[in-house]
């Protein structure tokens, strides 16, 4: 389990492993030195990067209001648990985390994706003594609950107890997630995100770019743009014109990327649907203004399965679009996620997916066996796939993609690539190229890192590869 420890003297947390579940709130607990009883908050953050950003915002407000965020249940006057409710296993993990916090501390405020609808009722019935239950992005409600149980310090002076301009971050200093919108307009049958987070609500473009600017000024080298549907950014406000640095900027994906490309950091796009207007962003990648990297949730390739999922079912056109993008930007890296064993998926449907995968030649791929989610419309579909068939198809899928990945990485051997360093152990460093997002993609492990620092870039000669990762040697600076 990973514990993120917040040090107020730094702009971001230091990550270390914890071997004591009873000592530290899990699984992503945030800790800070504390000097005063009666004003201490424990924090447990679960779920995806979008939930992580929610946690960062709550933690920032806690610090602004003068609270200390502490590393142990025993030291906390109250514990906030930010839950995940995307799939049933995540819900169980959230319930377990709430249960542990109740057992170890007893004073618990619950928020996040499980804090809405039927799931909220389950929490209240399972743990009737929780102090408060609120849904995702309910920042004011969470702070109100904290204030109600532990009033802020009367003597707190925000001019003395400084919070970094970029706020509290749970990621290492050199990269950060930038959430550009909340909610989703899609109604996929396997997903309950719209039920939890509502329809798409885009953040004002000035707020998005202002946050990015503060992050870069604080030392962030890589910005990971996230949302439920990045390519739909601004559609809810009809691409309204906002302002940044005194100039007009449309609330739209293209203009956002153009502006982010001016900041001098790596800009990585996640959760991009392959709409036609994404074509306009590819030239920015070819020109080096943003990273030539797209994370696209294809989910499947069979027209029938996609129809059952209520997803776009024109994979032939998608292949044409991918070919067009690669022609415009040969360095383009594509990552995606897929679901196998969706209700009604036949062997023929699965073979269509494997054939499509071979033709698409994606660089990075994740795959999940379909898992029922309470409240999802897919639960009512006929012909659910047996667990053993889902597992067998998952293994065949991963074997197919593993071969594609290995072949693509082998082609990089002998080339020199820029690597951003994530960790260093003596002379050995681990980092990522532009082709790899943190935590979900591959890494580059290279020697010759003595004297280097985490967050720096290093030119690395690639000397080896396996199915997912690269190895290399740092290229000495000739100057």
UniProtKB/Swiss-Prot annotation:
It catalyses: L-aspartate(89)-[ribosomal protein uS12]-hydrogen + (sulfur carrier)-SH + AH2 + 2 S-adenosyl-L-methionine = 3-methylsulfanyl-L-aspartate(89)-[ribosomal protein uS12]-hydrogen + (sulfur carrier)-H + 5'-deoxyadenosine + L-methionine + A + S-adenosyl-L-homocysteine + 2 H(+). It is found in: Cytoplasm. Residues 170-407 form the Radical SAM core domain. Residues 39-151 form the MTTase N-terminal domain. Pfam families: Radical_SAM, TRAM_2, UPF0004. [4Fe-4S] cluster 1 binds at residues 48, 84, 113. Binds 2 [4Fe-4S] clusters. One cluster is coordinated with 3 cysteines and an exchangeable S-adenosyl-L-methionine. Belongs to the methylthiotransferase family. RimO subfamily. Catalyzes the methylthiolation of an aspartic acid residue of ribosomal protein uS12. NCBIfam families: 30S ribosomal protein S12 methylthiotransferase RimO (TIGR01125), MiaB/RimO family radical SAM methylthiotransferase (TIGR00089). This is Ribosomal protein uS12 methylthiotransferase RimO. It comes from Saccharophagus degradans (strain 2-40 / ATCC 43961 / DSM 17024). The lineage of its organism: Bacteria, Pseudomonadati, Pseudomonadota, Gammaproteobacteria, Cellvibrionales.
